[in-house]
A protein has these predicted regions:
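Structural signature of hydrophobic alpha-helical transmembrane segments
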Residues: 1-5, 44-60, 104-118, 166-177, ...
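Transmembrane alpha-helical segments of multi-pass membrane transport proteins and ion-pumping complexes
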Residues: 10-15, 29, 33, 37, ...
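Membrane-interface junctions of multi-pass transporters
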Residues: 17-24, 33-77, 190-200, 204-282, ...
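Transmembrane helix boundary and interhelical junction motifs in multipass membrane proteins
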Residues: 23-27, 119, 221-225, 319-324
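Small-residue-rich segments of transmembrane alpha-helices in multi-pass membrane proteins
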Residues: 28-38, 81-94, 140-156, 197-213, ...
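Membrane-interface alpha-helices at helix entry/exit sites of multi-pass transporters
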Residues: 73, 133-149, 154, 241-245, ...
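Transmembrane alpha-helices that form the ion-translocation and gating core
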Residues: 77-130, 263-366
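Membrane-interface helix-loop-helix junctions at boundaries between adjacent transmembrane segments
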Residues: 98-112, 123-167
Length: 368
């Protein structure tokens, strides 16, 4: 019965998003908040598996959208934007939480990492809905968001992870896998093109599943790996538009809604208390405005218009994937307590909802 309620919530809020004009991904997160508090979603292990496929599929498709020539052309802009949008909020949050909440260096660093991220998984469908993926701004934003995830991943690894020879060995195998997978794909797609068994689609789904395995072994975000793999496959799939359309249909209709539902289910009202609410009330405006200003100012200096600069400042406040991953890591490792974890998740979800409402309200002013 729980499975039926999950699907019903996802479909209902999908229709609601079309009626009120909010992003489908955001409404699916809201569905997850409701479902996570009314249903025992943790007892449905299939949701975790499908949600993993959702983030992998989204990021793979996002990587496919990047144009290599545009990426090279605007690489410096993306790097500058990403560095400002990550390191400025990181420093502000880190320096503020140390004295105010009496956290130690590692605790403050983890909070700062979790709240300095930008979710490419949320940015991609929103840019897609607004038709920005084929424009220069779309390439700059997506590349910058990917770099922010990489900065977050590197920060978490340097500060907390213990890298050994096994990790290094798996990383070497991962590099070989990512190098040869597109070459194998080119041969398979040519040999088994448009067959009834859908071998090309099965191959892509297998590749995504393999990335999940490697992500766990080398402590790298699966979102980053899937995005990079999609970028490497972009030339291979140029002549296979039908295959890409099939993958988009599966991801956007089935896998990604479950991913966003699962993300919303992390926000538990039952474990909220006065401490977590106070911490969240302090961190939400601090993280939102530090991210907004650091993104807006830099993008405007890169010759972006006022409305576009505001838009970038707002959408870079979409935190989700790596923010939740960092918070879960800190909770399981005993670095942060449940109150701090709840506050982080609350800020991540709230900032995404606020950003979505703002972009919806000013949608007519974004693109001139």
């Amino acid at each position: 019965m729980k499975e039926l309620w999950v699907i019903l919530l996802i479909v209902s809020f999908g229709f609601l998003s079309l009626e009120i004009g909010l992003s489908t991904a955001i409404l699916e997160i809201v569905a997850g908040i409701i479902g996570g508090n009314l249903l025992d979603v943790g007892s449905l292990p299939w949701i975790d598996f499908m949600a993993n496929y959702g983030i992998l599929g989204l990021m793979f498709l996002a990587g496919l959208e990047l144009d290599k020539e545009e990426l090279k052309k605007h690489a410096k802009h993306s790097l500058l934007l990403a560095s400002s949008a990550y390191f400025v909020p990181f420093c502000v949050i880190f320096l503020a939480t140390l004295p105010i909440f009496n956290l130690d260096i590692k605790q403050s660093a983890l909070v700062a990492i979790a709240l300095s991220t930008t979710s490419l998984a949320l940015l991609y469908p929103i840019l897609r809905e607004r038709g920005l993926l084929n424009l220069q701004i779309g390439h700059v934003i997506m590349a910058a968001a990917m770099l922010i995830d990489i900065w977050s991943m590197i920060s978490l690894t340097i500060i907390f992870a213990a890298i050994d020879y096994v990790t290094i060995s798996f990383f070497a195998v991962l590099i070989l896998f990512m190098w040869y997978a597109p070459k194998l794909g080119r041969w398979l797609f040519s040999r088994y093109r448009e067959n009834l068994a859908e071998m090309e689609l099965k191959f892509l789904l297998l590749i995504l599943l393999a990335l999940l395995f490697f992500a766990e072994k080398v402590m790298v975000s699966e979102a980053v790996l899937a995005f990079m793999m999609g970028f490497l496959f972009s030339e291979v799939l140029e002549e296979h538009g039908t295959l890409v359309d099939k993958l988009k249909g599966i991801v956007f209709a089935f896998f990604s809604p479950i991913f966003f539902f699962k993300a919303g289910s992390f926000m538990k009202f039952s474990i909220m208390n006065s401490t977590s609410l106070i911490v969240a009330a302090f961190l939400l405006p601090l993280s939102f405005f530090s991210k907004y200003l650091s993104s807006k100012v830099v993008f405007k200096r890169l010759r972006g218009g006022e409305s576009l600069s505001k838009f970038v400042g707002v959408i870079f406040n979409f935190r989700l994937t790596f923010g939740i991953v960092s918070a879960l890591f800190g909770l399981k490792a005993g670095i942060i307590n449940p109150e701090t974890y709840t506050a982080i998740i609350t800020v991540i979800i709230a900032s995404a909802l606020i950003s979505s409402i703002i972009t919806r309200k000013e949608e007519g002013q974004i693109i001139q």
